[in-house]
Amino acid sequence: AVGNVFARLVGTDESLPVVMSGSHIDSVKNGGRFDGLVGSIGALEAVRVMVEEGYQPKNSIDIVFFAEEEGSNFQVPVMGSKLLTGKLTVDDIKEIKNEAGITAYDMIKNAGYDPDNMPNDVIAPGTVKNMIELHIEQSVRRDKEGHTIGIISGIAGLNWITITLEGVQNHAGATPMFLRQDPMVAASKIIAEIDGIAKAINDTIVATVGYIEVTPNIPNAIPNGVKFVVDVRDIQQETIQQCVDEIKAVTEKYAKENDVKFTVEKTASSEAIKIQDYIKEVMVEQAEKLDLDYVLMPSGAVHDSNYMAEVTDVAMIFVPSVDGRSHVNEEYTDWDDIKAGVDLLLNTLVAISQ
């Protein structure tokens, strides 16, 4: 109904919950060609090998390609998995708009899908046994430390908070500094504080401002509005909230100092996820059988698995990103590392589906 793509290797007992694997097929603007696609094509390749070898699982295996994981169109990430797990409704997507003012509902419909059928696509409890996602690491640790495989012990939660500042537009040359109500000044001070707020909390939390919108965005006028999005992530839910609260406090402080109005709105969130011990043990066992150099590690990025964890036990496999680069054209993962990741995915899928 919304652009998620599925394929199934039918098992010998179709009454059993399915085992699912896959990732997303979209990217960010000016992004790379490995993020998401390694896990999507990796799942397809793992199932292709099963078919080639004549293996039929007991549990059916579903390959899934999730739509709109990055949030590039609507600044709402992981839409495909949110819709699959009932976290977004038809009414919600009628309200979500992109920069051109097109709603998610209309874009889905114009692409030939039926968004009104979304409720029928929501995964029913007990119908998915596990979701296993292969992904590039998107960080420098595996590449620098030399491990081929990361077996994920937990997935970071995320909050996106949208901060809007409203001032008074006026002439850049004729308006004295002491008479200005400049939202850009307030925004710059808030953004400068965010780095220190995150660093003071712990070593795992991260906070990023990667999107900013200024109106009217011309060089010879004081802006009347600034909107920016703060991306806060950590493997502990309570520290995410602490960071958000402190950002709200400095927003209020600098808005008042610069005599501008402000709003702070949470526009996206996902809970931190703990990977269940039994599935980690299966993956460790299979990694050792394959003689892979692996390490247990947390994931700092949010993935579709965060939302799939609402309906099933999830697990993730990471392969190294060269120089830690991701969401850039230079994004690259060595093909031998991808093969190792797909081998572990294949063995894990076989182990939990028989």
Question: Language-model features: where?
Answer:
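Flexible, glycine/charged-enriched surface loops at secondary-structure junctions
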Residues: Q56-P57, M118-V122, A174, G196-V209, ...
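Acidic, glycine-rich active-site loops and adjacent beta-strand->loop/helix elements
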Residues: V5, I25-S27, I61-S72, Q138, ...
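A short beta-alpha structural unit
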Residues: T208-N217, V229-I235, K261-K280, N306
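Short beta-alpha connecting loops at secondary-structure transitions
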Residues: D91, R233-Q236, T267-S269, G324-W335
